[in-house]
Amino acid sequence: MMNGVSIGLLVVAALVPTLVQAQQPTPLPELSYNYAELSYDEGDFELEGSDGIDGDGLTLSGSFELTEDWHAYASYSNSDLDSSIDVDTWALGAGYRYPLQDNVDIYGRVLYINREVDGPGRFAAEADDDGLGLQARIRMRVSEVFEVEGGIQHLDVGDSDTALQASARYHFTRNFSAGIGMTFAGDTDSFGINARYTF
């Protein structure tokens, strides 16, 4: 017949695997480049020949993983600036990610960009511009639900412009998240909110 000590040892032996497993950290979800996103942005813009003007707009964007490291990217944005200026911007390109460690990536993108400006006076004459964009960013999942990202972007569309970007994202579920972002450039400062579906 087993005594109390033997029973106690058996209970401890049975609990050890459970306790060890509970102490091991839960792996964070991997960073995904398969997503569709809708964002709203507003900010101050400086156009050549004008004082600073305010504006806001919507952007629909998406990314799709082609391989483990490569992804395709596309976006369309429509912005309304005061003084009755309407700006449509298309972007299409490809990106490459390099994992620094688990849940920390650096990635870059090369983009072809088309921008159409429709407005009164001198803006009507600058209706269509094509150019290139370069992005370099670091992306990090800091917890199960929180993600941060920052980097630099250079656009050469009509005029050349370099911007610093920073954003934070909260993951409500594995598929749905919301974020905020800020852009600081020589002629544009903007703030935005977004909703993203990851697939």
Residue ranges and their predicted role:
Residues 89-91, 95-97, 101-153:
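Detector for outer-membrane/organellar transmembrane beta-barrel domains
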Residues 21-80:
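Short glycine/proline- and aromatic-enriched beta-strand/turn motifs that initiate or cap beta-hairpins
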Residues 1-32:
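Cleavable N-terminal export/targeting peptides
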Residues 34, 68-74, 101-106, 140-150, ...:
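Repeated loop/turn-to-beta-strand initiation elements of outer-membrane beta-barrel proteins
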Residues 36-38, 62, 72-74, 94, ...:
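Membrane-embedded beta-strand positions of outer-membrane beta-barrel proteins
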Residues 166-171, 175-177, 188-199:
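Outer-membrane beta-barrel "beta-signal"
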Residues 32-34, 54-58, 86-90, 114, ...:
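Residues that define the transmembrane beta-barrel architecture of outer-membrane proteins
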Residues 40-46, 66-68, 76-82, 98, ...:
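Transmembrane beta-strands of outer-membrane beta-barrel pores
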